[in-house]
């Protein structure tokens, strides 16, 4: 959800994008997509940008809801039945950046809807939303657990960090030369953007209690953690996954403190 231009804008499981009057809550307009809308909209220059599970990314006039353009993404190259956009967009210098379940990360011209460039991610979805700062775009992947830094203008890869297949749903936050992002491992990672490495990590209480979830080299022990339980009891499997203390929400940095929530039920404030 985003508030801008006197309106409140959000997507819904009924496939609509809604615009409400911020003062009264009355409906200004709604726009029907072809599937559910999980992503939060971004607004720039009076245009609303948001993706849908119908595999299209939309640009709408924020005042009227009129479609300005739509951009068609693809399908997962491995599973082939996975499409759609969960990543919220970032807009900078006339370009819209977003990830997709077709395993690509896209840069699209904000005015025309034409692709500027795309970056493939080896069969891994990009659910995490990007951050853009000082000519660079930052995002992370799900299945492969990679954190990428690309040149925002050209899409040229600058460097990547490998988090050993621990998925990222959390989106990055940048403050004071440090980027903060959480993973399914239950760790908040502080990445020094100048040194291009992890400066420190914080482990949630749930993560500390679930040593069997990791192998000796730090990669996920899926068999011990999830698969046996999922096959026998879906409810127990989900509970086990949540108990790992994964960080699915995005951190917020304010002053000298970073705030983040976890599936272990805690909200943490770190200094």
List PLM regions with ranges.
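Short loop/turn segments that connect beta-strands within beta-propeller blades
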Residues: 21-25, 61-65, 109-113, 151-155, ...
């Amino acid at each position: 959800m985003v508030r801008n231009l006197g309106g409140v804008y959000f997507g819904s499981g009924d496939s609509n994008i809604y615009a409400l009057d911020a003062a009264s809550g009355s409906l200004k307009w709604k726009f029907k997509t072809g599937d559910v809308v999980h992503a939060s909209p971004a607004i720039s220059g009076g245009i609303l940008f948001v993706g849908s599970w119908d595999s299209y990314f939309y640009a709408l006039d924020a005042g009227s809801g009129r479609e300005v353009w739509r951009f068609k993404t693809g399908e997962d190259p491995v599973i082939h039945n996975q499409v759609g956009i969960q990543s919220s967009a970032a807009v900078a210098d006339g370009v819209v950046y977003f990830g997709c379940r077709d395993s690509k990360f896209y840069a699209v011209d904000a005015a025309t809807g034409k692709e500027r460039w795309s970056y493939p991610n080896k069969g891994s979805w990009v659910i995490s939303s990007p951050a853009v700062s000082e000519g660079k775009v930052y995002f992370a992947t799900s299945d492969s657990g990679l954190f990428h830094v690309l040149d925002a203008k050209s899409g040229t890869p600058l460097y990547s960090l490998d988090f050993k297949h621990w998925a990222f749903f959390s989106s990055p936050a940048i403050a004071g030369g440090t980027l903060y992002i959480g993973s399914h491992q239950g760790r908040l990672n502080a990445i020094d953007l100048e040194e291009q490495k992890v400066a420190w990590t914080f482990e949630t209480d749930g993560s500390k209690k679930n040593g069997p979830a990791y192998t000796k080299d730090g990669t996920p022990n899926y068999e011990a953690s999830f698969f046996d339980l999922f096959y026998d009891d879906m409810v127990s499997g989900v509970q086990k996954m949540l108990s790992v203390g994964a960080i699915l929400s995005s951190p917020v940095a304010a002053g000298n403190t970073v705030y983040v929530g976890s599936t272990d039920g805690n909200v943490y404030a770190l200094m």
